[in-house]
């Protein structure tokens, strides 16, 4: 039930391990910090990370007449979260399902969750261009998707797979809002200088290739990693960091691109 949601944004990448879930959670927290009501939907069925990243593991979800009630991170209910992780008894339990069952669960997540009025719904997806992605795109076409943010790392091995994701978006008619380059450089936790331990500017070149906006470059910052397991925004904890600067810029870009 997405009729009360103003903006639906999908976070995608053709490559696993590039930090989609971290970007999704910190973007959601940054939007909340800016006064928006936000929903975060984790549809990575085989590797749900959002409950862990926000310290919500073990929380229960309930059903009402309107569908599943999401988990709220605060009493004012400004950030609502839904993930298959809430349905698993143990974090180590694997999800061993065939395609049709995965498709059914994703459709339930997109149509049977009771989202209240939201300014933004951020959807964290699994890597690749599989059945899950096709199901998401088909469902979102029915209710409306305002665009996709594509996350990549600067290495060529990641860029190759992300190019396929860009082609997938174009073939399925999903508007690409832009590309975020993650894990670009390492921030020293002592002096905060940034060293390019891998290649750099891969996201910039990819954005130029795809003719879409480059939304920012995020470094590897151990101080950000410490925030995993909490609902603390980088904007609150590390306001002077590069990560906070990029997220602030990203929020401002979304405000100009989409309905506020």
UniProtKB/Swiss-Prot annotation:
It is found in: Cytoplasm. Pfam families: ParA. CDD domains: Mrp_NBP35. One of its GO terms (molecular function) is ATP binding. GO terms for biological process: iron-sulfur cluster assembly. Binds 4 [4Fe-4S] clusters per heterotetramer. Contains two stable clusters in the N-termini of Nubp1 and two labile, bridging clusters between subunits of the Nubp1-Nubp2 heterotetramer. Its cofactor is [4Fe-4S] cluster. [4Fe-4S] cluster binds at residues 188, 191. Its main location: cytoplasm. It comes from the Eukaryota. ATP binds at residues 14-21. GO terms for cellular component: cytosol. The keyword Metal-binding applies. Keywords: 4Fe-4S, ATP-binding, Cytoplasm, Iron, Iron-sulfur, Metal-binding, Nucleotide-binding. Component of the cytosolic iron-sulfur (Fe/S) protein assembly (CIA) machinery. Required for maturation of extramitochondrial Fe-S proteins. The Nubp1-Nubp2 heterotetramer forms a Fe-S scaffold complex, mediating the de novo assembly of an Fe-S cluster and its transfer to target apoproteins. Heterotetramer of 2 Nubp1 and 2 Nubp2 chains. Belongs to the Mrp/NBP35 ATP-binding proteins family. NUBP2/CFD1 subfamily. This is Cytosolic Fe-S cluster assembly factor Nubp2 homolog.
């Amino acid at each position: 039930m997405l009729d009360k949601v103003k903006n639906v944004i999908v976070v995608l990448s053709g490559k696993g391990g590039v930090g989609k879930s971290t970007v999704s959670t910190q973007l959601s927290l940054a939007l909340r910090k800016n006064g928006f009501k936000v929903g975060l939907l984790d549809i990575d069925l085989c590797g749900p990370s959002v409950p862990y990243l926000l310290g919500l593991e073990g929380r229960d979800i309930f059903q009402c007449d309107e569908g599943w009630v999401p988990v709220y991170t605060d009493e004012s209910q400004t950030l609502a979260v839904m993930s298959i992780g809430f349905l698993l008894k143990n974090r180590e339990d694997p999800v061993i399902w065939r395609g049709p069952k995965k498709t059914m669960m994703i459709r339930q997540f997109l149509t049977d969750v009771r989202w209240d009025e939201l300014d933004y719904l951020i959807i964290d997806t699994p890597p690749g261009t599989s059945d899950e992605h096709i199901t998401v795109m088909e469902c979102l076409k029915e209710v409306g998707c305002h665009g996709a943010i594509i996350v990549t790392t600067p290495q060529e091995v990641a860029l190759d797979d992300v190019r396929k994701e860009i082609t997938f978006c174009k073939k399925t008619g999903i508007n690409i809002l832009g590309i975020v380059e993650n894990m670009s450089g390492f921030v020293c936790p002592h002096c905060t200088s940034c060293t390019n331990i891998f290649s750099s500017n891969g996201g910039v070149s990819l954005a130029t290739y795809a003719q879409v906006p480059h939304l920012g470059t995020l470094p590897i910052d151990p101080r950000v990693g410490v925030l995993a397991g909490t609902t603390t925004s980088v904007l609150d904890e590390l306001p002077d960091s590069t990560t906070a600067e990029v997220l602030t810029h990203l929020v401002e870009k979304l405000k100009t691109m989409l309905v506020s």
